[in-house]
Swiss-Prot record:
Domain notes: The presence of a 'disulfide through disulfide knot' structurally defines this protein as a knottin.
Disulfide bonds: 5-19, 9-21, 14-27
Keyword annotations: Disulfide bond, Knottin, Plant defense
GO biological process: defense response
Sequence position, cross-link Cyclopeptide (Gly-Asp): 1-30
Protein known as: Kalata-B14
InterPro entries: Cyclotide, Cyclotide_moebius_CS, Cyclotide_sf
Family, as annotated: Belongs to the cyclotide family. Moebius subfamily.
Entry function: Probably participates in a plant defense mechanism.
């Protein structure tokens, strides 16, 4: 959910461990 991971995921995936592309295109932590 939150907070944001400081990463965008236009490609649909996040490189930051523990982060998910939700809501697209923003990476957030569970």
């Amino acid at each position: 959910g939150l907070p944001v991971c400081g990463e965008s995921c236009f490609g649909g995936t996040c490189n930051t461990p523990g982060c998910a592309c939700d809501p697209w295109p923003v990476c957030t932590r569970d």
